[in-house]
Amino acid sequence: MIPYLGPLDLFPPVEMAREDMGGLLAVGGDLQPDRLLDAYRRGIFPWGTVEGQPLWYSPNPRMVLFPEEFRLTRSLKKTLRSGKFEVRFDSNFRGVMANCASTPRPGQDGTWISPEMKHAYTRLHELGWAHSVETYEEGVMVGGLYGLAIGHMFYGESMFSHRTDASKVAFAHLVDYLVNNQFGMIDCQMYTDHLASLGGREIPRDAFQARLSALTASGSPRTVWSTDPLDPAR
């Protein structure tokens, strides 16, 4: 039986997540900033809804990427050095979410990024917790990603690309920023071949939870991020 959360109910222990249901832990609650931040600090994230109620997950194993293990391929390094794309941080958070929601994905019918999700994460962005990285070509946004930063932990949520390597360029700049600001881990949530190609790997949930506690200990919002002047292709 999956627990149902009322407005004041706390999350159950992550060990109660149903591995036969992809790590589903609970249903219900709300998407207010305090609940979302509490969820992420506990290693829990919302993914989709049923009858308007959020679904909360804590999968085992957990897909992560350690910034120092980011795989910068020769072709991506060439793209970065070409100067084809301009990269900005926190310049169009709403636009990134809208593109992530509307971009078709193989094997996915529709999107889990509902209007309620957009509102919730936009509010976290306004509070300084959620951030975006955008890739532009001739002034038009063609790729990007968004996620949350708590302490020295980054939680990746979604990315999109309308040009070859556009989202990878954004990700490379994100990793460079995280390395230079002593972030220890990127939560990628669930396995995909794309994330694995960038250096992501699965680790046991208990190992993820142990690292999470230390990395989120100094969890204050970082306000607006500025574009990293360093070159991730160096």
From Swiss-Prot:
Q: Which GO terms describe its biological process?
A: protein catabolic process
> Could you tell me what reaction this enzyme catalyses?
N-terminal L-lysyl-[protein] + L-leucyl-tRNA(Leu) = N-terminal L-leucyl-L-lysyl-[protein] + tRNA(Leu) + H(+); N-terminal L-arginyl-[protein] + L-leucyl-tRNA(Leu) = N-terminal L-leucyl-L-arginyl-[protein] + tRNA(Leu) + H(+); L-phenylalanyl-tRNA(Phe) + an N-terminal L-alpha-aminoacyl-[protein] = an N-terminal L-phenylalanyl-L-alpha-aminoacyl-[protein] + tRNA(Phe)
Q: Name one GO cellular component term.
A: cytoplasm
Which top-rank group of organisms is this from? Answer: Bacteria
Q: Where are the transmembrane segments?
A: none
* Any one GO MF annotation of this record: leucyl-tRNA--protein transferase activity
| EC top class, as a word | transferase
Q: What is its EC number?
A: 2.3.2.6
Q: What is its main location?
A: cytoplasm
User: Which protein family is named in the record?
Assistant: Belongs to the L/F-transferase family.
Question: PANTHER family from the xrefs?
Answer: LEUCYL/PHENYLALANYL-TRNA--PROTEIN TRANSFERASE (PTHR30098), LEUCYL_PHENYLALANYL-TRNA--PROTEIN TRANSFERASE (PTHR30098:SF2)
User: What's the protein name?
Assistant: Leucyl/phenylalanyl-tRNA--protein transferase
The species is Dechloromonas aromatica (strain RCB)
**Which classification does the entry list for the species?**
Bacteria, Pseudomonadati, Pseudomonadota, Betaproteobacteria, Rhodocyclales
